[in-house]
Amino acid sequence: KEGKGVRSILFFLPEKIQDAKIVNYLVKVENPLPGYDIGLVCSEKSKIFYPHIDNVKLFTFNDEDLNYFDTIKSLSFMSQIKNKSYDAIVDLNTGFCAATTMLAFELNAPLKIGFDSTVNRKIFTITLERKENTFLESYFSRILSLLGAKL
């Protein structure tokens, strides 16, 4: 975006509770990043991991929105998200998640950040290699740094 950085970010929230605890702390869902237009995507099942998301734009999908391959088939869900154009998409799932990976593929954003996998290398502009002995906090801090955001 002409070197001005990102102003709007769509975060795909993790489906695993252990990752959700860290994301709640780092992304400060109770108090979203000041000065940024934030959107969040998660499944209805994982929504319970994020108790303080009333004050941000939240998109949730359920099992009926998914097809046989666990990717999003719901046109109404897709059109809700496509109503807004985001500068960046960040998938915070540390493992492969078919629904969010294919959603990232479908959406047009100049910057897409996710964790490394064979599929994600084709879809995301930046992938972060997950190392078992590295704390998740350092990855999330790096993501915010790549976005030009500060905690």
Regions found by a protein language model. Give the residues of each.
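Glycine-rich, highly charged phosphate/nucleotide-binding loops
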Residues: 60-80
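Short internal beta-strands
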Residues: 36-48, 115
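Conserved nucleotide-diphosphate donor binding/catalytic pocket of glycan-assembly enzymes
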Residues: 92-151
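Histidine-anchored nucleotide/phosphate-binding helix
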Residues: 11-12, 16-36
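Active-site regions of enzymes building and remodeling cell-envelope glycoconjugates
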Residues: 52-63, 123-130
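Structural motif
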Residues: 8, 12-16, 42-44, 88-90, 92-94
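Short, charged/polar "capping" segments at the starts of alpha-helices
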Residues: 18-20, 46-51, 122
